[in-house]
């Protein structure tokens, strides 16, 4: 988490690019982006540079609804785009859709830390994204030499298909099936 510089709680694209540049300089191997917004040239460039540097990027698909335009950074091709499903593997009704969706993960009524009091349930693609980030981190811990493309391929190939057979605009390749942390 990064401190905010203004009273406004939202970050602009410049602040996001600056934060991602900082993370790249720290040589992180994976970044969770539980946020979504419009396309931005500077952000697209930073995402490309991080991918080329071997950094895995996982982002929330967005909560604009089925008819919403693709949200970024999830819609950039170098990013693993995550949608949210409930306990019955039904897509979150406000989740964005599109060809760029890669995986589905739990994101409805997720018990999470709250800024005011301890913890509470929250819903959205931002709450599904950390599940995929954690699964990617497990893969990378086991096999440190994996490239971002290889991490993506492993996660997508192990997903449990939901919805229409194969990749679709609602669930992507399907429900995340994380690697066993004990094997």
Regions found by a protein language model. Give the residues of each.
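Hydrolase catalytic cores
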Residues: 2-5, 93, 107-175
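Generic alpha-helical structural context detector
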Residues: 18, 84, 137, 153-157, ...
């Amino acid at each position: 988490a990064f401190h905010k510089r203004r009273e406004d709680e939202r970050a602009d694209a410049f602040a996001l690019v600056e934060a991602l540049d900082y993370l790249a300089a720290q040589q992180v191997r994976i970044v969770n982006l539980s946020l979504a917004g419009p396309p931005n040239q500077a952000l697209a460039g930073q995402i490309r540079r991080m991918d080329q540097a071997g950094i895995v990027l996982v982002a929330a698909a967005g909560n604009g609804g089925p008819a919403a335009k693709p949200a970024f950074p999830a819609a950039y091709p170098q990013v693993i785009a995550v949608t949210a499903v409930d306990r019955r593997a039904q897509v979150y009704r406000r989740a964005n859709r599109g060809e760029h969706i890669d995986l589905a993960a739990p994101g409805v009524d997720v018990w999470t830390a709250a800024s005011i009091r301890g913890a509470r349930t929250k819903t959205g693609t931002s709450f599904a994204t950390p599940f995929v980030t954690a699964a990617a981190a497990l893969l990378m811990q086991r096999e440190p030499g994996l490239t971002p493309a290889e991490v993506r391929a492993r996660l997508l190939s192990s997903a449990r298909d939901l919805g229409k057979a194969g990749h679709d605009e609602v669930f992507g390749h399907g429900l995340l099936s994380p690697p066993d942390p004990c094997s």
